[in-house]
């Protein structure tokens, strides 16, 4: 039986060579103690596009994603080597402020993690840690973030209710609102729909399409159909190596590496 390829629906029209680069890694390696999780990663992520990272479990996708906002700095014995440039500046440099980085690079995790406080305070929380503004300005920022996350119409009359009362899909969109409230330029999404039902997943995917007009988005997903639907570019990773990175249409229809071909056609992984 011939192997069925995944239909491509994402709009990946711009070649890598003409799209401005937002994030670039140079000879990037990462270590969990003595274990090397990433090996000489050289990757350019285009601005205001969606880049998907695919590959089997344990290949380094989430590790790479978390380097982009240095979340590993919270834990001892974890070390990144090499360079990661955001808008031309090396974010791995000790001179690059963590607070500055976190305001420019937002992150949404696999499981929705709303704070045990009101919907309003969930969105306002991060803003208060980075900026000082009056009540009316804060109200505007909270509304803007909820509008961008396609949640405003559902919660505008219950902003003072506990966020834990929202559905799973609403909670994940709230987490996206919390991330965009800081007006970052990059959004990192680590399997943002894996814990959601199909309807909520569809809402998040539609939202990603809307958000990429303002943000550079990097998404980790185990769902190759999702990668094909939402991304403009795709990187395939295996055992800590970046095997191939190209336009999504190219990756799924005519990959240049046999390992990529084998993975997307289900021969391994």
UniProtKB/Swiss-Prot annotation:
GO biological process per UniProt: phosphate ion transmembrane transport
Enzyme Commission number(s): 7.3.2.1
Bilayer disposition of the protein: Peripheral membrane protein
Binding site for ATP: 55-62
Any single GO CC term annotated in Swiss-Prot or TrEMBL for this entry: plasma membrane
Catalyzed reaction equations: phosphate(out) + ATP + H2O = ADP + 2 phosphate(in) + H(+)
Keyword ATP-binding: yes
A GO molecular-function annotation: ATP hydrolysis activity
SMART domains with a match to the protein in the record: AAA (SM00382)
Quaternary structure annotation from Swiss-Prot or TrEMBL: The complex is composed of two ATP-binding proteins (PstB), two transmembrane proteins (PstC and PstA) and a solute-binding protein (PstS).
Role, per record: Part of the ABC transporter complex PstSACB involved in phosphate import. Responsible for energy coupling to the transport system.
Similarity section: Belongs to the ABC transporter superfamily. Phosphate importer (TC 3.A.1.7) family.
PANTHER family registered for this protein in UniProt: ABC TRANSPORTER I FAMILY MEMBER 17 (PTHR43423), PHOSPHATE IMPORT ATP-BINDING PROTEIN PSTB (PTHR43423:SF3)
Protein name: Phosphate import ATP-binding protein PstB
Gene: pstB
